[in-house]
């Protein structure tokens, strides 16, 4: 009987651990190749709306998130300029198996929904065939409700970082502003003060 109880406890424990593991992805430390000059990246920067369905590696995703909005200094400052030192945006990653919140400090992706939302990233459903969509979630309360222009500036800086990263690393990308915000808010279980400001589709070249 004792052996059976121990076995059941172990099985339950393993199941719990597996459940957590299945909903959490620990990304590797960012390690950008650094072979492309800024001049070349700027020359290649463009919008491309076709994507290979081939998945990005976890290192690719980690590098992409770091370039977009990562911490680049010991004082915690990031790769984008912001007003008053306030970071008003959070990053989510939409993959085929669901949407994940990027926990920046630990570089962890935490699943918030198992729904495949990629096709809902834009009105033309371009994201349906792409492996990944970055989702920028803004906080209306970041500047006491009076900082919409600051938030837009921050989102624009993130968007351009993504474009330059993709140009330098031979990925295709397109930023999208036309999508059903209410649908995203419901899927991500966002509080009333938060909303999706932009989505950006990223994928390998075809």
Report residues per predicted region.
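Flexible, glycine-rich phosphate/dinucleotide-binding loops
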Residues: 100, 108, 143, 182, ...
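A glycine-rich helix N-cap at a beta->alpha junction
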Residues: 190-206
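N-terminal amphipathic, basic helical "cap/leader" segment at the start of enzyme domains
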Residues: 20-130
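Positively charged n-region of N-terminal signal peptides that target proteins for export
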Residues: 1-4
